[in-house]
Amino acid sequence: MQPPYIQERLKSLNDIETQLCSMLQEASQVTFIFGELKRGNESVKPQFENHVKQFYERLDKSTTQLRKEIQLLDENVGTRLLPINVNKKALGQDTEKMEEQLDLLSAILDPSKSK
């Protein structure tokens, strides 16, 4: 089981993620209703304004909370959290895999040019 501090941070990050997903839903609604407004449907203007307002409120709240989490992380590196030393062990494998996938895609799109 994680220490309480880590559990709190994970819960907070989960809440931020939920808010960001909700914000994306609002953005989707804004886009849809904007299309309706462009078609001349003026009756949806109050909904458009409401969704835009909700989008910006959620954006503000989630960025504020994320900034707080980043600040807490900065303050606790070296005290509650150990500094992490990352060593790359699989150098070049990501490039090889990408090239392999691009070759497969090329073969699918144009079989005459396959290697």
From Swiss-Prot:
The record's annotation in InterPro entries points to:
Mediator_Med11
Q: Pfam families this protein is in?
A: Med11
GO term, biological process aspect, one:
positive regulation of transcription initiation by RNA polymerase II
Q: Name one GO cellular component term.
A: core mediator complex
Give coiled-coil spans as residue ranges.
56-107
Q: What does this protein do?
A: Component of the Mediator complex, a coactivator involved in the regulated transcription of nearly all RNA polymerase II-dependent genes. Mediator functions as a bridge to convey information from gene-specific regulatory proteins to the basal RNA polymerase II transcription machinery. The Mediator complex, having a compact conformation in its free form, is recruited to promoters by direct interactions with regulatory proteins and serves for the assembly of a functional pre-initiation complex (PIC) with RNA polymerase II and the general transcription factors.
Give any extra note attached to this record. Answer: Present with 396 molecules/cell in log phase SD medium.
The name of this protein is: Mediator of RNA polymerase II transcription subunit 11
Organism of this sequence = Saccharomyces cerevisiae (strain ATCC 204508 / S288c) (Baker's yeast)
In the UniProt record, what gene is named as encoding this protein?
Answer: MED11
